[in-house]
Amino acid sequence: MAEEMIPAWVEGVLQPVEKLEAHRKGLRHLAISVFVTRGNKVLLQQRALSKYHTPGLWANTCCTHPYWGEDAPTCAARRLGQELGIVGLKLRHMGQLEYRADVNNGMIEHEVVEVFTAEAPEGIEPQPDPEEVADTEWVRIDALRSEIHANPERFTPWLKIYIEQHRDMIFPPVTA
């Protein structure tokens, strides 16, 4: 894995830190998460088996860390293209959240996350990069929580946190 510098806080100062170091030390760092929807479904990805943490687990459509100096919307669009071959969707910023979770092998995600959604029209289908994504699946939003409860071992810690604690921010209830 090439050295990748991401924005992380060290002694209260935001500075470039190598990504693996941020995870090993559990440093608070910036991240983005994207949820691509189509009607009442959301696109999930199964992380590639070669990932250094949480391999093979199901996550939201796309999540990553911005490069040092990269803004969140640019990062979100870049990663949607790189991981899933999805380009040109209008990203909607839904808000910011923070979480901390053990992700295995002594790694900790302590992320300040900018959350985005995007609606994918019919005909837009993911073309996953196999180095990043093992599989994809469109899942009904209203069934996702019960699927996570029934099979928690299949899902990343952050997706469980997002759906349990931040579902209404990510998927606001429809009002008449």
UniProtKB/Swiss-Prot annotation:
Summary of the function given for this chain in its UniProt record: Catalyzes the 1,3-allylic rearrangement of the homoallylic substrate isopentenyl (IPP) to its highly electrophilic allylic isomer, dimethylallyl diphosphate (DMAPP).
Gene encoding the protein: idi
InterPro entries: Idi_bact, IsopentenylPP_isomerase_typ1, NUDIX_hydrolase-like_dom_sf, NUDIX_hydrolase_dom
A Pfam short name: NUDIX
Cofactor: Mg(2+); Mn(2+)
Catalytic activity: isopentenyl diphosphate = dimethylallyl diphosphate
Compartment(s) of residence: Cytoplasm
Pathway assigned in UniProt: Isoprenoid biosynthesis; dimethylallyl diphosphate biosynthesis; dimethylallyl diphosphate from isopentenyl diphosphate: step 1/1; Porphyrin-containing compound metabolism; chlorophyll biosynthesis
Example GO molecular function: isopentenyl-diphosphate delta-isomerase activity
UniProt keyword Magnesium present: yes
Entry's cofactor comment: Binds 1 Mg(2+) ion per subunit. The magnesium ion binds only when substrate is bound.
Name the record gives this protein: Isopentenyl-diphosphate Delta-isomerase
Organism superkingdom: Bacteria
Chain ranges of the Nudix hydrolase domain: 27-161
Species annotation: Rhodobacter capsulatus (strain ATCC BAA-309 / NBRC 16581 / SB1003)
GO CC term, one of those recorded: cytoplasm
